[in-house]
Amino acid sequence: MLIVPKKCDIITKYTYFCERIGFEMKKELSKLYDPKEVEDKIYKFWMDNDCFKAHRDPDKKPYTIVIPPPNITGQLHMGHALDETLQDILVRWKRMSGYAALWLPGTDHAAIATEAKIVAAMAEEGLTKEGIGREKFMERAWAWKEKFGGRIVEQLKKLGCSCDWSRERFTMDEGCNKAVREVFVNLYNKGLIYRGERIINWCPHCKTSISDAEVNYEDQAGHFWHLRYPLSDGSGYIELATTRPETLLGDTAVAVHPDDERYKDMIGKTVVLPLVHREIPIVADTYVEMDFGTGVVKITPAHDPNDFEVGLRHNLPVINVMTDDAKIVADYPKYAGMDRYDARKAIVADLEAEGALIKVEDHAHNVGTCYRCGTTVEPKVSTQWFVKMEPLAGPAIEAVKTGKTKFVPERFDKIYYHWLENIKDWCISRQVWWGHQIPAFYCDECGEMVVTKENGAVCPKCGKPMRQDEDTLDTWFSSALWPFSTLGWPENTEDLKYFYPTNTLVTGYDIIFFWVIRMMFSGLEHMGEVPFDTVLIHGLVRDAQGRKMSKSLGNGVDPLEEIEKYGADALRFMLATGNAPGNDMRYIEDKVKASRNFANKLWNASRFIMMNLPEDFKLGGIPANLNVEDKWIISKFNRLAKEVNENLEAFELGVAVAKLYDFIWDVYCDWYIELTKPRIAAGGETAETAQAVLVWVMQGMLKLLHPFMPYITEEIWSAVSDSDVPCILSTFPTYDEKLDFAVEEAQFEKIIAAIRGIRNRRAEMNVPPSKKAALHIETAEAEIFEQGRLFFERLASAAEIVIADKVDMPDAVTVVTDCARIFIPMDELVDKEKELARLNKEKAAVQKDIDFSSNKLNNAGFVAKAPAQQVEAEKAKLAKAQEKMAKIEQSIAALMK
């Protein structure tokens, strides 16, 4: 059944609420805009009136975004703020554009991270999870989730996120749990999930397996220890080098390349393992690089993934020498219980004492660390659950190649393809308790194993109760189902039929593998369709110096603190302005301040309009008797609406917001409002027309700006609009051919260009606005400039205006535009000698700046050693000084005429 609210219901609720909390139509706006007074009130209004709620409507196209579910352990950071701001902009735009827009929210259970926090809290009470048992631990975990899991949601609301909170989901709620079991069983029955002994990545701190994608690699300074392994027959020794002497205890072979002439005669012989004195074979394997090190490799199948593969090929035994917390096992009494790094020192000392250590070399190498805690990962042979990836990767590659899903920017296709074309089976089992317990059951009586969606399985062979697998699933397993599990799958719900596939996924490039790829193959496998049409990739938010924000650097910025200082709209506007798809951006607080100043500019413009409207003012659309400047602003707004829609359609959100900024600040506030002031002061019909156009354009601007700055636009909308519909539910402006006054717009731009040129020249000559100047305008388009007489007088401080097709004033200062030359006699305005003295003094100071920057940039040492950012800043400084010098010289030349 389709549920569509009646528009009158929304209007009635809106009007009632406006009256109840003091939203008065055409109310007087306060002198200053205070976000703290407005934001909570506005958000409550939206929530109380179900403004975010999505309804299935056969007359509307659906537009769906699923939120990348933040961890319940999470605190809103700048990455979240950027991610959610971009999504909210798109959803608000589509909602206003007539779509049934659903932004589906939720949170992720974050298995390892959440369990770590709960275990730490228990440790303060002197408790362990093993000590209280799984059932009691899970009770504590759910209690922790209820207490702390909603913090991130409240923080998203502070940002202004217009999610449909009535549909909020959690990756471990009943519906998601049902979907997870369904998928696991389906994939297992197809042979795409299997259990086996493989070498996996083990985190000794988290004490769980992690997938290849969850390992971060970093260069670390280390050593090559060159060791002597004596031949068993006493005929000599073989030399090899290793970065991990502590794993020597588990060596089961040494390997050489079959084509290496140095060692051909040794293949098949045995060596004596130092310290352990166990005989191990010399095997030939093409894995060995002849020209690296000594061309000999020790093989430890239990502690290196490549060695594990060599071991399989040569049927070598697997000897594990470490416990789950990376300590030496009891089989080696001298080192038993030692941490791996302490054992390394002890073993190296013993090797030296035994005469097996030849030399030690410095060596930098890649070390894998756990993405959660940063601990060095230990390769470990273990029985785990895996997803067979190759059969799932093919359709996911094809879906992007055929355009069913596109990446924005397109260059991220390559990263996507690279991951899928080189993918390995996914280790999905984790040795933690908080998460989806694997639906596999074992019979201790007869050894039978059953994979089933049902709880409390009974052995089908012997009828005895079965115990469930202790392990849980990788957090990303449930996240991979997010686009359809949140809409009711595996049930074929009405929501699923209407809102799936979703439209846009907004996410960072750092989780393309973790999440995007896994959602792609999950959607294709279980729904038969891609999960989303478009993947919009954004970069990281870095600090002002371009560094990644991190706890270690202490350079993180709390979005909530910035919202407290400047308001949510200012933060959102800055994030949108600095965003270009796929690129990192820098967080610069001055830009947030500039965004707040922009909000204040808009507020003040609105106050001016409201203060100058008559009590009986009624907006009846655009009047018929428009002046040229009215047609100019209407036409420019009409084109702005067209371009903003095009930019949003192309995901150029930063471009759209820059155009809005320029139009509102420059075109509307600095020009059109100033142009209307004399008309409003004069009163009569021309004032009424100006007021009507001011309000009409303001309303349109508020609607265009609303997705970016929702709070202030909604507040002003309640004052300047006669509509009973709130701004969030109003209609987004689009291009209207009837409002395209291209001819008048072009004509008036010529007047604007002339006024701007006159103002600039007067400023360069240090002429204050209070001094009136004569203007002699030479132009072939006199009719256009005749229309601008009033504007030249008011905005260009013109006293006398002469318009002619020919002007001869060689001693006057000249302003040149594309259709006119404007002569300004300066004799009565400027004391030439005094002004020349000032300009020459300024010229000398600027020359010093030019010389300083030039000398710096001509210094090869500075250019080579200084940070690139500093060099570029110096170049920009030089260019600015040179530009200033050119203007000074131009002013001097004008005065010397």
Specify the residue positions occupied by each region the protein language model found.
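Non-catalytic terminal extensions that flank enzyme cores
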Residues: C8-M78, A101, I358, Y371, ...
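Residue patterns forming the tRNA-binding/recognition surfaces of aminoacyl-tRNA synthetases
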Residues: K27, L32, K41, F45-N49, ...
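Conserved phosphate/anionic-ligand binding catalytic regions in large, soluble enzymes, centered on
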Residues: A81, I238-V256, R372, E378, ...
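Extended active-site and interfacial segments that coordinate phosphate-rich ligands
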Residues: A81-I89, I238-P274, V297-D304, H314-N320, ...
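Secondary-structure transition/capping motifs at alpha-helix termini
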Residues: R92-A100, A121-R134, E154, K158-C163, ...
